[in-house]
UniProtKB/Swiss-Prot annotation:
Family in the record: Belongs to the PPR family. PCMP-E subfamily.
PPR repeat residue intervals: 77-111, 112-146, 147-177, 178-212, 213-243, 246-276, 277-312, 313-343, 349-379
Name assigned to this protein: Pentatricopeptide repeat-containing protein At2g36730
The species this protein was found in: Arabidopsis thaliana
UniProt-listed Gene3D superfamilies: Tetratricopeptide repeat domain
């Protein structure tokens, strides 16, 4: 880095500020810092503020350096401390934002309205509910409880920490709201499984004359929960409002259609998208694999590798392994599994090991699947064992070495109170005509008051999902169930048409 001694420069301070604006690496930042000391500018508040900004928020990010600067300075400007707090809030150590605020209080630096949004964002990042509640007390103390940005971040915090009632309370008490406020509360509802309330909230938003944006639609699409009719309705809103089909919105549409079984629509959106990222490709590949279009999924993966600059991630490989499972491609499954780490530097996760067990289990290679589990680099979870036990039930004639028995014992050791495990074991005994053993398992379940999770049936009618569970008390639900079935029968009758050849 070349420093000019030309007298045309108004001052060394001006020169330092120019280089700080151009700084793009820690190496350059340290050089500039050295020149600042040589120029005796190390106590200049504006220079310190710029140094903190660059080391907290730019490409030359070094939060430890920014922290040291502030600790050795007498800067009492809240905006400078806010920059360090903001840097920590989006770092791997968001809890350090709390230290920044504590240091501000110790020095008697009064916070401003930008102080608390960064602190609340940090609390959401490390799921610091207690810390977040303490920050909310500080918000009230300093009179920022009516600030819209503070409110939005409080909603985000409580939603992330699964406190939807608190999130809704903050939202309801806001005197000023913007689109982000509505998006925040709807996101909180989606993340906590309250999908029906999301669309009620959206209707309320429209009723209050707020204009939904791209984020609103992405949130609504994630709330469709496999409801194709509802997904189409949201898509129509995207088109009516003439929102740009960018990568983020397009990916949300592809993901929704793929999860809802509307693969033709997913393909149409996918093909029309100009910009696709790894999540777009992965959503399409996973959707195809899960709905039986395994060969097409593998072809699409091959196309992604050859014709685009996009590199696969862990979700992409999950879709690829799922496709191999559905087509019985055991050798290809092994190949892709090993390529993950060797070529693409993606360390296989539990879910990938489970997918390989599924591939081997479906192919009837029970011993191989069992050995594969025993060689895993970490302790397999119950899902992996259940996958193998399911395969043992299907291929019980080929289980010469009693793999099913070993898996059964291990599964009960891992989850002794999970009723589903004992149900699987009882069914396995029944399939093998071991009636006494099956009865014994059922007896244990009954004595320990262990109940099987009720089976659930879903019916989509008029854009709404209606759920029915086995074991309903007919005295309470009988009438409404049969009224709905009569309505369904009527709709089928109305839609029925004879086709003449």
């Amino acid at each position: 880095m070349i420093w000019s001694s030309d007298s045309c420069f108004k001052s060394r301070k001006h020169q330092c500020l120019i280089f700080l604006k151009l700084c793009s690496s820690i190496k350059h930042l340290l050089q500039i810092h050295g020149q600042i000391h040589l120029s005796s500018l190390q106590n200049d508040s504006f220079i310190i503020s710029e140094l903190v900004r660059v080391s907290s928020l730019s490409l030359a990010k070094d939060l430890a350096f920014a922290r040291t600067l502030l600790l050795h300075s007498s800067d009492s400007t809240p905006s400078t401390w806010n920059m360090l707090s903001r840097g920590y809030s989006s770092s791997d150590s968001p809890v350090e934002s709390i230290w920044v605020y504590s240091e501000m209080k110790r020095r008697g630096i009064k916070p401003n309205k930008l102080t608390f949004p960064f602190l609340l964002k940090a609390c959401a990042s490390f799921l610091g509910l207690t810390a977040g509640r303490q920050i909310q007390v500080e918000v009230l103390k300093h009179g920022f409880d009516f600030d819209v940005y503070v409110g939005n971040n409080l909603i985000h915090l409580y939603g992330t920490c699964k406190k939807t009632s608190d999130a809704r309370k903050v939202f309801d008490e806001m005197t000023e709201r913007n689109v982000v406020s509505w998006n925040s509360i709807m996101t909180a509802l989606v993340e906590n499984g309250k999908l029906n309330l999301v669309f009620e909230c959206f209707c309320e938003m429209i009723g209050k004359r707020f204009c939904p944006d791209e984020t609103t639609m992405v949130v609504l699409l994630s709330a469709c929960g496999g409801n194709l009719s509802l997904g189409k309705l949201v898509h129509s809103q995207v088109m009516v409002r003439e929102l740009e089909l960018n990568c983020r919105l397009g990916t949300a549409l592809v993901d929704m259609y793929a999860k809802s079984g509307g693969l033709e629509y997913a393909r149409l959106v996918f093909e029309r998208m100009v910009d696709k990222n790894v999540w777009t490709w992965s959503a399409m590949i996973v959707g195809l694999a899960q709905y039986g279009f395994a060969e097409e999924a593998l072809q699409l993966f091959s196309k992604m590798m050859k014709e685009s600059s996009v590199r696969p991630n862990y979700v992409t490989f999950l879709g690829v392994l799922c496709a191999c499972s559905h087509t019985g491609l055991v050798d290809d499954g092994y190949k892709y599994f090993h390529e993950m780490e060797k070529i693409h530097k993606i360390k296989p996760m539990m879910i990938h090991y489970g997918a390989m067990v599924d591939i081997l289990g479906r192919a009837g290679r029970l011993n191989e699947a069992y050995d594969f589990i025993k060689k895993m680099p970490f302790e397999p979870d119950a899902v992996v064992w259940r996958t193998l036990l399911s395969a043992c039930s299907i291929h019980h004639d080929e289980d010469d070495e009693g793999i099913g028995e070993k898996v059964k014992k291990r599964l009960i050791e891992l989850e002794p109170k999970r009723s589903g495990n004992l149900v699987i074991v009882a069914n396995r005994f029944a399939e093998a005509r071991m009636w006494a053993e099956a009865a014994e398992v059922r007896r244990v379940m009954k004595e320990t008051k262990m109940k099987k999770i009720a089976g659930e049936s879903c019916l989509e009618l008029g854009g709404s999902f209606h759920r029915f569970f086995s074991g309903y008390d007919p005295r309470s639900e009988y009438v409404s169930i049969y009224e709905l079935l009569d309505l369904f029968k009527f709709q089928l009758t109305c839609d029925y048409r004879l086709v003449s050849e």
